[in-house]
Design a protein with these regions (language model features):
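Transition-metal
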Residues: 172-346, 412-463, 467
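ATP-dependent small-molecule kinase phosphotransfer cores
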Residues: 22-94
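Gly/Ser/Thr-rich loops at beta-strand to alpha-helix junctions
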Residues: 1-8, 33, 100-104, 385-387
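Conserved metal-binding segment of the jelly-roll/cupin
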Residues: 301-304, 372-391, 398-400
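A short hydrophobic beta-strand segment most commonly corresponding to one strand
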Residues: 299, 322-323, 391-412
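Intrinsically disordered, low-complexity linker/loop segments enriched in Gly/Pro
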Residues: 328-382
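ATP-dependent NMP and nucleoside kinases share a basic, alpha-helical "lid"
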Residues: 78-138
């Protein structure tokens, strides 16, 4: 998987073979990439467009629809295939074919032992931040945000597709847990499958990921005893499929796997046939906590895209709908949802754009409706609805579109992030998807506690021997 420490593993393998007196030949697939300039121009045109008016901080793009082979020079790929075939015929010792994509459909049939190195999403992001990874086809590490964007839309996409093929078609001989380059664990592929199959016999919970944020609070930090060094805790990713991992204990040893590796291996057992038939091996729900308890402000005023917009522009599977379940509140907590009854929505958008340029605040409460937050309240947030979690509460956020995150911030109170940089605003995209018709009365009738609708009714019944 992308960012896994392949060079470290290859060095260890070479050393062990040398100790046994076995000759080693090494072939790196990174030599097969298309020329950097050619590949970068192609991706910029098709997947990573740079339009600073629409996307000021270059956050979004379109998922790459191909495979590793589609990023390689076909002549170089053919030459590599011929070289592998020749070595199998007349070579001596061991040839190590290594690199991201080495087990692609074209080259895999020529390999006698197929080993896959995997790593958790958190470890992958830490390696990106430390500059320990180069994007596909690049000679040096890009700036972190550019590297992360290219990873999401290209590198991670082709890596996940290949991992699915290898797991689903049982193509692996060995699987390496490569979260820590200094302490890797190699498992026979049959053992990996056995661990995952056994896990399906029990309830399981993912290992959470905790992130600081400019609006972060302190409820979860205190409740779960998080490190005091954390400035706060804004997001608690209990089940964001592309962010979390699972830990299983085997003979006293804890083994940590990416949750999505489990999904790709055990999809029907984990999600059920109906879900797989509808969504494929895509985990169709996510949930996380947003903590503004005793924080210094609200979440940003934001909205999310519907199906047509996000599929056409980003290549994603579907719309981003959400709901908030209010878990705990402090004094004055409110949840922002929809527009005020007589709000001038076009004026709000103009004010948001003006604020984005001149850095002056907007009277957002003049335009955005809010309700008093009470524990136990649930609000639905269909795509296109303006919304925000207000200060001083803990909410459980349940949503769809579980891999990407398309949050179009319309207004963020002229705040800077924890690094001192202005937070990104996406008024262009927000304007395109915003549903202007969702005002106070409609919100109260349809989105708060299910609109207080009666789904079914009948005569009461006492079950069991005692009331």
């Amino acid at each position: 998987y992308s960012t896994a420490p392949l060079d470290t593993f290859r060095n260890l393998l070479e050393q062990q073979l040398a100790l046994l007196g076995i000759p080693v030949t090494v072939m790196a697939v990174e030599e097969l990439w298309q020329e950097e300039e050619t590949l970068s121009e192609r991706l910029a045109a098709e997947n990573l467009q740079e339009d600073l008016e629409k996307d000021p901080v270059l956050l979004y793009g379109k998922l790459f629809s191909g495979s590793y082979e589609d990023l390689w020079d076909l002549k170089k790929l053919a030459a590599a295939k011929a070289a592998l075939a020749s070595f199998r015929e007349a070579g001596s010792g061991v040839l190590i074919l290594w690199g991201y994509g080495a087990l692609c459909d074209t080259l895999r049939p020529l390999c006698d032992q197929k080993i896959y190195l995997d790593t958790t999403p958190m470890r992958a992001m830490l390696r990106l931040k430390r500059g320990e990874y180069r994007n596909i086809g690049t000679k040096k590490a890009l700036a972190f945000k550019r590297m992360a964007r290219r990873c999401y839309y290209v590198d991670f996409e082709v890596a996940a597709k290949l991992r699915f093929t290898l797991l689903h078609e049982k193509q692996l001989d060995s699987y390496v847990i490569a979260n820590d380059a200094l302490s890797m664990s190699l498992l026979p592929a049959s053992l990996l499958e056995g661990i995952f199959a056994r896990a399906m016999e029990y309830p399981l919970r993912c290992k959470p990921v905790y992130l600081e944020g400019v609006w972060g609070g302190y409820y979860i930090q205190r409740l779960r005893g998080l490190p005091r060094e954390m400035k706060n805790c804004a997001w608690v990713f209990d089940m964001i499929p592309m962010e979390v991992s699972v830990v299983f204990e085997l003979n006293g040893r804890k083994l940590e796997f990416p949750f999505y590796t489990l999904v790709q291996s055990q999809g029907p057992k984990l999600m059920g046939k109906r879900s797989v038939d509808a969504f494929g091996y895509y985990f169709p729900v996510r949930f996380n906590y947003d903590d503004t308890y005793h924080s210094n402000g609200n979440m940003s005023i934001q909205c999310h895209p519907g199906e047509k917009y996000v599929t056409e522009n980003n290549g994603e599977l579907g719309r981003q709908d959400e709901s908030y379940y209010i878990v705990e509140t402090g004094q004055g907590a409110r949840t922002y949802l929809g527009f005020q009854k007589d709000a001038d929505v076009e004026e709000f958008i103009a004010e948001a754009r003006r604020s984005e340029k001149d850095g002056q605040p907007v009277d957002y409460q003049k335009y955005v409706y809010s309700i008093e937050s009470k524990p136990g309240t649930q609000v639905m947030i269909p795509a296109g609805t303006i919304h925000a979690s207000g200060q001083n509460q803990l909410i459980l956020e349940i949503g769809s579109l579980t891999v990407g995150s398309y949050t179009y911030k319309m207004y963020d109170y002229v705040r800077k992030d924890l690094d001192g940089n202005p937070r990104p605003i996406h008024t262009y995209h927000g304007d395109q998807v915003l549903d202007r018709s969702r005002t106070a009365d409609w919100v109260d009738q349809n989105l708060v506690n299910g609109g207080r609708r009666t789904l079914r009714k009948g005569k009461g019944r006492i079950c069991g021997g005692r009331a």
